[in-house]
Amino acid sequence: MEDNLRSSLLASMGEYEALGIYNEVKKNNDFIGFTRQYMHDEDYRVARNALWSMTKATDSEISQLQPIYNELIDLAMKTDNSSVCRLTLNILERLKMEKDDLRSDFLDFCLEKMTAIDGYPGIQSLAMKLAYRMCKFYPELMNELIVTLKAMEMDFYPPAVKSVRNRILKSLCH
């Protein structure tokens, strides 16, 4: 079974195939085992496709990945593959975040990624959302985030990043 699944993850995938993998994982109710097994695969296609399949999960299903929250953070920060990073950040953004979950290395990573002018819009936007969620717990960090957001030269960023930034600033001003 695992060899067939890995072969499927190695292949070029579309939405239909990603949903098929997700449904297989759902049937086995093994979201953590599947994610752990394939998120670090040496072939980035396997990791990317596995993570993409997990983005199809419902919020209650995704919440089953909460125990590997820190492993997902480590993956997002260490991967050289932008798709793996973006998909991992997408999953992290859907997980619960508590005050005690703050990792300064991850906050620094998110601040760096959200302001990187040459970055990918999906990564920038997700990093900005995650930085906001982390900073909400600490007024001094929130002030720093506001200064950083206001200092961003928005002429250099795509519409998706501008939109997330504006929504965050609007929510803080009301």
Regions found by a protein language model. Give the residues of each.
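Alpha-helical scaffold domains
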Residues: 1-174
